Amino acid sequence: MALSFFGGGGASHLKYFDIRLDEDYIVFRGGEQEAASAQLSGKLLLCLSEPLSAKHVRLNLTGISRVCWHLPSSSASGGRKSWREKVFYEKSWTFRDAGKSKTEILAAGNYEFPFHVILEGSMPESVEGLSDTYVTYRFKAEIGRKYAKDIVVRKPLRIIRTLDSSALELSHAMSVENIWPNKIEYSISTPTKAVIFGTSIRVDFKLIPLLKGLKIGQIVSQLIESHDLTLNPEDPDSVRNTYKNTRTIVNDEHELDEENNLEIIDEAAEGYQFSRFLDLPKTLTRCLQDTDTRGIKIRHKLKFRVQLLNPDGHISELRATLPVSIFISPNLAIDDNNNLVDQTPQSAQRAVNDLAQQAPPLYGEHQFDQLYSEVDPSGYRTPGPGSGPGTPFGTLSRNLSAENLASMNALTNTDISASALHSRLSNLHASRFSNPSPADTDGHTDVEHRRLGVSADYFGPSSGSNSHSPASPELSRRPSDEGYHDHDHIPSGMATPFHPQFAEVESLSRVPSYSTAVRSTVGPCDSELPDYQAVVAEDTAMPTLQSPQQAHIRSAGRGASTGHTGIDVHHLRSGLFNSRTSAHHDDDDRRLRLVQARARV
């Protein structure tokens, strides 16, 4: 290929001269403001059979943009042509330079001149396919000669700007649905807004006639490409000459077989539900990618027309439009003539599959989620049936449990498998309904712990009975409800309310008033918070409101059951009015305690 560019007598000594890139094209993922930089590297290869006299050996990379359009001619005047061409990027490498008016002799042999450059992510992508409008990059390698024609070889470079795997266009479905009163209920949708160039677009139709005797006529689906060209996009002060044009890329016509295609939709009404596939062209000359760079803006949309044959004989037409974005995938190579290298349906399907694995799955299609081996995921989905707002399963919620987190270190140091852990969790969930005796539960737990080599306090009562044990002075969580209604034998988290009601949640959210708080005693600053059993015991034998010990009502409201908390609060509020009739020395005593508490703080 390179030899066709050679000229002059010394060119016969040149056996090989070419530009070899490490990557066939450069890929930017994301828009111009978010894409990361990319490295372009390669080698300039030279093979000489005999010595060659040369002034220099150079390599240039040039980025050129051109915007041009032709206005149609009329009878009054001829056609008018508007155009603008600009070099927006240049990079040069000089491998050999003999100096001004000098030459050097390149000995016979093989030469490799490596080169590399960092391309910013904001660089324009290649736009090729239109006759006089483009954005291109070209390499030009040159061997300068003094008394002969220069030896030149050229190579194009394609820069692709594709979508990032987290782009919303890859996961958001596009749909238009509405009801034409007394005519038809319709829904037209596409699985995603973004479509890979060279593949196909799937369009899903759902048509439900609302008028008896209404028939569906011809259904036309079109892919429209719009061109918006601007001569001076960078200069806001100059006259912005613009030109707009559209062309039809795909035209699909379909007619329903009313007898065979009629079906029951959503178990409610009879209608038609089907899909159509619009195959995209395999060449950029017939279909461009969506872009907006260097005064060239390309956009695509789907237009639909559905004929409705009314019973009275007149014809109505339903029209709808959906936006669609076409992008070039790096997995489908494009040759120098702007055609797909592999145009088989299998290659297009592979590109779609690769894209599906890179993009995050849809909410209902999480087939790529990683699961633990041999773990049955049934029962682990939250919220469960009948669950309250934002409430997960009681036995599976770690936020509501009071397990000893320090004891989990023993679990991580053993070779326990995920299946064994799942078995223990399943047994724990089942024990909530069977309620075995404390002796049987302890015996079974000890045997299981010895078999697995795990400390006995894991899932044990000590996890919730004392959240401030020496084994875990800091790693603790808010205790659950065990211990108040005779649940001391139930492991941590087993007495968590399974379906908390709104009234219980409201009771748990109550906070003592300021007047209640000032009458409470204040402990020393260096004292620790009371443990769960101490709070429950204190809450069971509640003192009168004249005693400052009632300050623990907030802690009891969190740890005890919801019904108990409501009684406490009601009793506390009733006592507020009775305390106003108490003796005067009680008020003085409370004021003195308050002053002492503030002094300690």
Curated annotation (Swiss-Prot):
The keyword Nuclease does not apply. One of its GO terms (biological process) is ubiquitin-dependent endocytosis. Residues 374-397, 455-489 are annotated as: Disordered. The keyword Disulfide bond does not apply. Residues 475-489 have a biased composition (Basic and acidic residues). Keywords: Ubl conjugation pathway. GO terms for molecular function: protein-macromolecule adaptor activity; ubiquitin protein ligase binding. InterPro entries: Arrestin-like_C, Arrestin-like_N, Arrestin_C-like, Arrestin_domain-protein, Ig_E-set. Residues 461-473 have a biased composition (Low complexity). GO terms for cellular component: cytosol; plasma membrane. It comes from the Eukaryota. Component of the regulatory network controlling carbon source utilization through ubiquitination and deubiquitination involving creA, creB, creC, creD and acrB. May be involved in signaling by recognizing appropriately phosphorylated substrates via its arrestin domains and then recruit a HECT-type ubiquitin ligase such as hulA, leading to ubiquitination of the substrate, providing a link between ubiquitination and phosphorylation in protein regulation and stability. Belongs to the arrestin family. Interacts with hulA. This is Probable HECT-type ubiquitin ligase-interacting protein creD. It comes from Neosartorya fischeri (strain ATCC 1020 / DSM 3700 / CBS 544.65 / FGSC A1164 / JCM 1740 / NRRL 181 / WB 181) (Aspergillus fischerianus).
